């Protein structure tokens, strides 16, 4: 049983020869400590799946800060993950200015194309992206997003529809190129519980997540849901697998 067969056996609810290992991200320090040049070499040696992230271009680079195609400004990370520093949606009028980066740009899938060519049928090919929540957070800022959910729910819903429609196209494209599954990486919680109320999740996010998951299944792929924190009742969706960083507790 090779790595691909091992992972797919688990997703088909059968017993493999051993537990497969997959991971969405590894610190550069760990990668280098194991003598690998990059994350993909590390995954090829030690994991049963190759996880590749969607790629967005850097449009402005001012040393410690850079801006991507969404108009979000980030601060360069000391470790692995950059953090948004400036959010382009500051007020209700800014919602109308949102232009979602196109889904059909080949640049989005550069790493995926290479992974499929090298590992298709040998290891599970996992394409990592978001559905909507963290894009909304980074476009608006967390506090501002919560305020807009209360004050301008219609504008928030229109923004979420733009984002999730775009991400559905991206997921379909990735699967058509040879990805076996989609790893969706929106964080919905911190250690003590969800970031948003069950009512807000059910009203705004659950219907769109359902549409997103259904689109992946209809395209023949599997869905892995990643989230930091204790997601509580948010975890009831139709996921094939949950990659949860903190213990998940049902109420």
Give, region by region, the residue ranges found by the protein language model:
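Cofactor-binding catalytic cores of oxidoreductases
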Residues: 23-25, 54-55, 68
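Glycine-rich loop at the start of a catalytic domain that most often binds anionic cofactors/ligands
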Residues: 32-41, 65-68
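Active-site loop segments of alpha/beta catalytic cores
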Residues: 1-36, 76, 99-251
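Short, polar loop motifs at secondary-structure junctions
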Residues: 56-59, 110-111
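Secondary-structure transition motif
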Residues: 21, 48, 59, 72-73
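Catalytic domains of carbohydrate-active enzymes, especially glycoside hydrolases
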Residues: 40-57, 173-177
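A contiguous, low-structure linker/loop signature
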Residues: 60-106, 118-123
